[in-house]
Amino acid sequence: MKDFLIIKACGHKDENLEIENIKSLAELYGMNTKVVCIENYDSLQEALTSNGQYDYIYLSSHGGSDGFCNELRTLDVKWMEFGELICESDCLKGNSILLLSCCRGGLNEVAYDMFWNCLKIEYVVGPRQSLTSSDLLIGFHLLLYNLEHRGIDPIVACDKVLKGTDIRFKCFDRMETESDPAFIARCKELDKLFDIE
C-alpha cells in the first residue's frame, strides 16, 4: 500500500477544502494518508522527520521561483532548503513523487534546485503558472487518476492534465532532467555558489 503525506502550509480560505478533497482522493486509490499542518520551519522539519517514508508528498502553500511560504509568513522556505530537509529526513520511498500545489511549483528552477540538493528526489510535479485552489485541485485530480488508476507514466500523466484543462502542469523526472543542458548549467552555477568542486 502506498503512503501519501499532505503538508498543509498555506492558510488561505480554500485550503481546508483542497486538503480534504486530496486526502479523500488518495484514500479512494487505496493509499494511507497523513495530514500535517505546518506553521513554521521547525514544524516542517518535524513533519518530515517523524512520520516515516512516503510515495507522495503533497505540499499546499504559496509558492514562487525561490521558495514557498504561508499566508502569515511564519513559514518561508527556499526550494533548496526544502530539498535538504527531504534528503536529511529520509522521508521518501523509491520513485516517490513531490506534488507542489502552489503557484509556480512546476518551474524548471524549482525542480533543478530540488534535484541538485537531494539525490533521493525522483519526480517533481507542479503548475507552471499562478492558479486558484480549484484549478490546482482539478489538475491534481487528473494527475492522480492517470497515475494511480490508469498506471500512466508521470510525465504522460502531466501531459493529460494540459490536454484536459489547459492547465500547464510539469513533471520533472530526475533521470531525464540530469542530461538537460539547462540543468547541467544550473548545477555548475550552484556548485560555484556553494564552493563545491
Per-segment meaning from a language model:
Residues 11-14, 41-43, 63-67, 104-108, ...:
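Short acidic, S/G/P-rich loop/turn micro-motifs used as interaction or catalytic elements
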Residues 33-39, 124-131, 173-177:
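A generic structural motif
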Residues 21-30, 47-48, 86-90, 147, ...:
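Hydrophobic, Leu/Ile/Phe/Ala-enriched alpha-helical segments that form helix-helix packing faces
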Residues 48, 53-85:
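A glycine-rich, hydrophobic loop/mini-helix early in the fold
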